[in-house]
Design a protein with these regions (language model features):
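Short, well-formed alpha-helical segments that are part of the catalytic scaffolds
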Residues: 13-28
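Glycine-rich, basic loop-to-helix element that forms the pyrophosphate-binding segment
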Residues: 61-79, 100
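Signature of alpha-helical transmembrane segments in polytopic membrane proteins
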Residues: 40, 259-264, 274-341
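Conserved donor NDP-sugar-binding/catalytic core segment of glycosyltransferases
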Residues: 92-128
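Short, flexible, basic/aromatic active-site loop/helix in glycosyltransferases
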Residues: 133-172
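Active-site-adjacent helix/loop segment of glycosyltransferases
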Residues: 208-284
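Short aromatic/hydrophobic "clamp" motif used to bind/position activated sugar donors
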Residues: 84
């Protein structure tokens, strides 16, 4: 039996996959590790690259995109190890990442799952490294933007648990699917990833089932990985919002009572509509901001010059009629700005 089985699900991210496999190779030097790449019908030459550069990697090649959960399960069922690591292809491990995580899991038998500190490609901490359970309130606070406004609040910031230090090891509710080290015998007890979740939400569901079984989910910042985020998907797209919303509702229907699931769906709907409205207002404001400022500056310039001319050249107070300031100048400036933009 191996110490660790690493499972990477790939979908058209050849260059990121190459990066992560190099980092896995480096981090596995003194360990007994097997690595699986499950490909969801990529067309970018990913698997040819793996076979050429990483012959030690075990592969599963699907003829269609089976989704994140099912693809992971394919490899987990074939794995023979004490621990399983679900790892995104758009990540990079430190050389000590695997050794430190395995050591912690070995010393803490009550830990069912473990996640690490993640940073993005710019070195910024990713708040999804540690998350709370998406209760109706927590989901509403996140999707409405209240969590971003009050990140340190235990009430509003519960989704990403920002009141917990990013540098301290803590028990958390939810681990990120980008790096999720799991105890294999716990998976045998609670079941694998729920394949109802095609993408998004499966990590929340699995984390919740780990805690229901009496085990802990641990945020472990003693090692850091890079997660470039969303290379296989576009997080700002309408499709992402739709899929993420459906995943959250599916989680609620699965684990909450019918009444509570209904409240969850209501709060999510409300948050989505609120966020969409704010986004529309912001987009509209951002489009007219520069033309408006140009209009204002030019108009005030005309006004200042006219008043100066009246005072120091014409020596006649109110030489220009009020209509000049209220209608003529604004009209000319408006036409000029419109012509420019």
């Amino acid at each position: 039996m191996h110490q660790l089985s690493i499972v990477i699900v790939n979908y058209n991210v050849k260059h990121f996959l190459e990066q992560v496999l190099y980092s896995v190779e480096s981090a596995s030097q003194s360990l007994d590790v097997e690595t699986w790449v499950v490909d969801n019908n990529s067309v970018d030459g990913s698997m040819e690259m793996v076979e050429s550069k990483f012959p030690w990697v075990k592969t599963i090649i699907n003829k269609e995109n089976l989704g994140f959960s099912k693809a992971n399960n394919q490899a987990i069922l074939k794995s023979k190890s004490r621990y399983v690591l679900l790892l995104n292809p758009d990540t990079v491990l430190q050389e000590d990442t695997l050794a430190k995580c395995i050591d912690y899991m070995d010393k803490n038998s009550d830990v069912g799952g473990l996640g690490v500190r993640m940073i993005d490609g710019k070195g910024c901490f990713l708040p999804e490294s540690k998350r709370g359970l998406p209760t109706p309130k927590a989901a509403f606070y996140k999707m409405s933007g209240l969590a971003a406004l009050f990140p340190k609040s235990r009430e509003f910031g519960r989704y990403h648990m920002k009141y917990l230090s990013e540098w301290e090891t803590n028990e958390v509710d939810v681990l990120a699917g980008a790096f999720m080290m799991l105890r294999n015998d716990v998976l045998a007890e609670i079941g694998l990833l729920d394949e109802q979740f095609f993408m998004y939400g499966e990590d929340i569901d699995l984390s919740y089932r780990i805690t229901l079984a009496g085990y802990k989910n641990i945020y472990f910042p003693e090692t850091t990985i890079i997660h470039y985020k969303g290379e296989s998907t576009k997080k700002k797209s309408v499709n992402y919002v739709k899929v993420f919303y459906n995943a959250m509702v599916l989680f609620a229907q699965k684990h909450y009572s019918a009444q509570r699931a209904g409240r969850f769906a209501f709060w999510i709907h409300l948050a989505i509509y609120l966020r969409a409205a704010l986004a529309l207002v912001w987009r509209g404001a951002s489009k007219i901001w520069v033309p408006f400022m140009d209009f204002l500056i030019v108009y005030l310039g005309y006004f200042g010059i006219a008043r100066y001319w009246e005072a120091y050249h014409k020596f006649v107070p109110n030489f220009y009629p009020i209509d000049y300031y209220l209608f003529h100048v604004p009209a000319y400036v408006f036409i000029a700005v419109i012509a420019i933009f």
